[in-house]
Amino acid sequence: MLVVGLTGGIGAGKSTVARMFAARGVEVFEADEVAHRLLEPGQPALKAVARAFGSDILGADGRLDRAALRRRVFAESKARKRLEGIVHPLVYAELARLVLGAAGSYCVLSVPLLLETGRRRFVDRLLVVDCPESLQIERVVRRSGLRPEEVRAIMAAQVSRSERLAAADDVIVNAADTAGLEAEVDALHRRYSLLAAA
């Protein structure tokens, strides 16, 4: 099975592209969804994160207060690395399990921090969704309510745009209309299907 890693900076449009592949019948596994499941109440990962960062990152209902944790980890790189050391191995183990059970000729792993975690070798091809940084900031502010400086802090913690593009096997530029994006996904879907059959 061909494994395509889908990545890009925050607000680049990874989720939109992932949905387009899924609409074409491709199994898409989202690292963020896996991480959310692993951090549900009662899960060992949440207990480990609470031990590492203190119970003030939990809400009254026992759920993770993502905003509180985000403020802490993006303010201090050591805290971010500690969180990643707890969560990322569990996420990749679950993604590997999902890939083993996947049907079809290829699957897509949508992993925002694929390069940052040094897991490029985890995938056969790297697809980067790209757009201008100003558009990334605009999109994230619009959808999340974060302030522009908060978005910039998140972007600063990610691999640079130029590093992502240099590592890519394939690039989708998501700066225009949906029809153009659909056409790019169609072309890549055909290409990946052929590569998987070879």
From Swiss-Prot:
UniProt cross-references to PROSITE patterns, sorted A to Z: DPCK (PS51219)
Compartments where located: Cytoplasm
GO molecular function list: ATP binding; dephospho-CoA kinase activity
CDD domains documented for this protein: DPCK
Classification via Gene3D superfamilies: P-loop containing nucleotide triphosphate hydrolases
Keyword vocabulary terms for this entry: ATP-binding, Coenzyme A biosynthesis, Cytoplasm, Kinase, Nucleotide-binding, Transferase
Pathway(s) of this molecule: Cofactor biosynthesis; coenzyme A biosynthesis; CoA from (R)-pantothenate: step 5/5
A Pfam short name: CoaE
Main location: cytoplasm
Boundaries of every DPCK domain copy: 3-198
GO cellular component terms, A-Z: cytoplasm
InterPro entries for the chain: Depp_CoAkinase, P-loop_NTPase
Residue sites binding ATP per the record: G11, A12, G13, K14, S15, T16
Keyword Kinase annotated: yes
Transmembrane segments: none
Reaction(s) catalysed (UniProt annotation): 3'-dephospho-CoA + ATP = ADP + CoA + H(+)
Role played: Catalyzes the phosphorylation of the 3'-hydroxyl group of dephosphocoenzyme A to form coenzyme A.
Family named by the database record: Belongs to the CoaE family.
Name of the molecule in the record: Dephospho-CoA kinase
The species this protein was found in: Methylococcus capsulatus (strain ATCC 33009 / NCIMB 11132 / Bath)
